[in-house]
Regions:
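Conserved beta-strand positions in repeat-built beta-propeller and related beta-rich domains
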Residues: 44-45, 51-56, 85, 92-97, ...
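A short beta-strand motif characteristic of beta-propeller blades
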Residues: 30-34, 39, 68-74, 110-116, ...
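Secretory targeting and sorting signals
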Residues: 1-32
Length: 651
């Protein structure tokens, strides 16, 4: 059969309704086709349409060859199998719930006619052959065997002659109660393949070929009582006296009997294209779709799909599959289904030395051997050729292996992609592997490491870059201490003729400075860093003194012996920062530390300390404010000592 496929989904335990139908036709938008459940699918090659019966929604849907919904008709109560007339002018739908065959216009899905079938169950399966439309039916509960009926479209019911005829299956006492599956093939006109296994007793099975070209059906070959495979599907094979039974075994027929001639791995559904290609849905639990060439039992192509039905386009250019999903069965379009899909392996060394030869090898495997002398395209992608450079093509050996040598001029990650363009029997294929090719380490340095600078100093940092290939660009980054200031790019540019490049950094905090070379195809990236340090800005203002004057060579602030000096320190602010207040007194010819205390800075960076007066004259004291890295509440600057302020108390 070249244009249709059927499912064996059984609903014989359902009491079917014979209510009148209301038929509604709707035009669909360009969206994927999903049906609740389906018994039949047929392909119209002339119109490039795929018709699917949706039993869940009592409708027939039409899709284009891209799998998009283009039309639908509802009200086909219990729609089961579908078939196109031999001339393609009529689409027939078996409506099992309303017990009728509905004739539709395949171009519009308008109803052309309805043919009631006086059967207890069915009609279930339908096919066109010998100028008539054939269908199978049965009685409820297995009271009678399944049988064959026909419709003669040339008979006008208004003439008083019923176009529907029942009881035409020429084999009696076969014991199978369920309506049998039908199939026809354009290459063998006038023949029907009939097959089924009994719903109640799977040991009872039926396989037959019937000639329906004459006035009455004539049995050509039959086998009943249990073939060697469950007859859950049947296909009439094109161009010869053979059928495919149960989607698995090929039977030749002659002298009224069947002889098994070949078999495929076990399957449950199948469809056969006019050119003999077989598409098979795997057994329960393995619903992959496999495609077999005529006379071959090894699949040329396999699709990992959870499929329930398949149907060929008449020209075999496409295979249509209903694939199970959360919302039902979705139509999938499989293009070039008869082409073998090559698998290519690429094995390159994991590491290599730049400018040294390396060897890449691999193998091409396919269900159909590549033609002799087949060539593979080789592309190398690296830093110098980011869009790829085509290397000389490599020829595949008779055993499918290949190898080639190359000398990578660029270091870093080098990718070798090996591709086959495809041919009349193969799809395109491609694979790749990567090599880490060595690069030299460039010389890169940066000055000013460990130096300490005054707060806010503008300090030039100079990077020196040694020999490289093409890239002479250096970046200088600064990362000030403290989480509130991120690392930032200060400057980027090309080194001068001496290999130097400078950028000025504002030293408001201790700062890590980076020089970055991003590498080129011969030299690897490199980053160096230095850390330079910045002091805080600190000053102290003295007040409440009555004069200043020197004692020896040192200037003192003079206070009355009972006046408390007020000392206001201004220091670079940072959240949580404290100043250390150092106090010393002079006696016995030297300075002696009295106390050191930490005082918090305000958000304005100021700290005011009032010093208690000694109450006696002749006392000398001095104080200073200090930022201590780590002890002053943070570590973003370097320890900084303020200058001493000298105090003298007099009468």
């Amino acid at each position: 059969m070249g244009t249709r496929s059927i499912s064996i989904a059984t609903a014989l335990a359902v009491v079917f309704s014979s209510a009148a139908l209301t038929v509604v036709v709707t035009a669909g938008s360009a969206s994927a086709v999903t049906v609740g459940s389906s018994w039949g699918m047929v392909v119209d090659g002339a119109r490039h349409r795929v018709f699917i019966g949706d039993d869940t929604r009592d409708k027939v849907v039409a899709a284009d060859y891209n799998g998009n919904l283009v039309d639908s008709v509802s009200g086909i109560d219990g729609v089961a199998d579908l078939a196109l007339s031999e001339d393609g002018s009529t689409l027939y739908a078996a409506a099992r719930a309303s017990h009728e065959i509905v004739a539709l216009d395949p171009a519009t899905l308008d109803v052309k006619a309805r043919y009631p079938v006086a059967a207890g169950s069915g009609p279930l399966y339908v096919e066109a052959a010998g100028g008539k439309v054939w269908f199978t039916y049965g009685e409820w509960g297995g009271e009678t065997e399944s049988d064959l009926g026909s419709i003669d479209p040339a008979v006008d019911p208004a003439s008083g002659t019923d176009p529907v005829s029942l009881g035409q299956f020429p084999l009696h006492d076969h014991g199978v109660t369920g309506p049998a599956i039908l199939d026809a093939d354009p290459s063998t006109p006038g023949l029907l393949a009939v097959g089924q296994r009994d719903f109640y007793d799977s040991a009872k099975q039926l396989l037959a070929v019937v000639d329906v070209s004459g006035p009455a059906p004539r049995l050509v070959a039959s086998q009943s009582g249990g073939p060697t495979v469950y007859v859950n599907d049947v296909d009439l094979l094109p161009g010869g006296s053979a059928v495919l039974g149960g989607a698995t075994k090929r039977y030749a027929y002659a002298d009224g009997a069947f002889t098994e001639t070949a078999s495929y791995p076990y399957g449950q559904r199948a469809d056969v294209a006019p050119n003999g290609l077989v598409a098979q849905v795997g057994p329960v639990g393995d619903y992959r779709v496999s495609v077999y060439r005529p006379g071959e039992s090894k699949a040329v192509r396999t699709y990992a799909l959870d499929a329930s039905q398949v149907a060929w386009a008449p020209d075999a250019s496409r295979l249509f599959a209903l694939v199970s999903g959360p919302g039902g069965d979705t139509l999938r379009v499989l293009t070039n289904p008869a082409l073998s899909v090559p698998a290519i392996t690429v094995n390159a060394p994991s590491t290599a030395t730049r400018a040294k030869p390396l060897t890449v090898s691999g193998k091409v495997t396919a269900t159909v051997k590549l033609p002799a002398g087949a060539q593979l395209k080789v592309t190398r992608t690296d830093m110098e050729y980011p869009n790829g450079k085509t290397l000389p093509a490599v020829t595949v050996k008779a055993d499918g292996t290949y190898s080639f040598c190359d000398t990578p001029s660029s270091g870093g990650t080098v990718t070798y992609q090996v591709s086959y363009a495809g041919d009349a029997e193969h799809t395109p294929a491609s694979a790749y592997d990567k090599v880490a090719v060595s690069r030299a380490t460039p010389s890169l340095s940066l000055n000013n490491n460990g130096k300490v600078y005054a707060y806010g100093a503008d300090v030039p940092f100079t990077a020196h870059l040694g020999s490289t290939y093409k890239n002479r660009t250096v970046e200088i980054w600064a990362d000030p201490f403290g989480s509130d200031r991120p690392k930032k790019l200060i400057k980027s540019g090309t080194v001068n003729s001496h290999g130097n490049f400078s950028a000025v950094v504002d030293m408001a905090r201790d700062t890590t400075v980076y020089a970055v070379f991003k590498g080129d195809s011969h030299y690897k990236p490199r980053t160096v860093k230095v850390t330079a340090y910045a002091k805080v800005r600190v000053s102290t203002a003295v007040s409440r003194h009555y004069k200043t004057g020197k004692i020896g060579s040192t200037t003192y602030y003079w206070f009355h012996k009972r006046t408390n000096p007020l000392l206001t320190t201004t220091m670079t602010y940072y959240p949580g920062r404290h100043q250390r207040f150092d106090l010393q007194a002079y006696y016995q010819g030297s300075w002696h530390s009295l106390d050191s205390q930490y005082f918090a800075l305000g958000t304005n960076g100021k700290s005011v300390v009032e010093l208690g007066a000694p109450g006696e004259a002749g006392v000398k004291a001095r104080m200073r404010s200090v930022y201590v890295n780590g002890s002053s509440g943070d570590s973003v600057n370097s320890t900084t000592y303020g200058g001493w302020k000298y105090l003298y108390f007099s009468n």
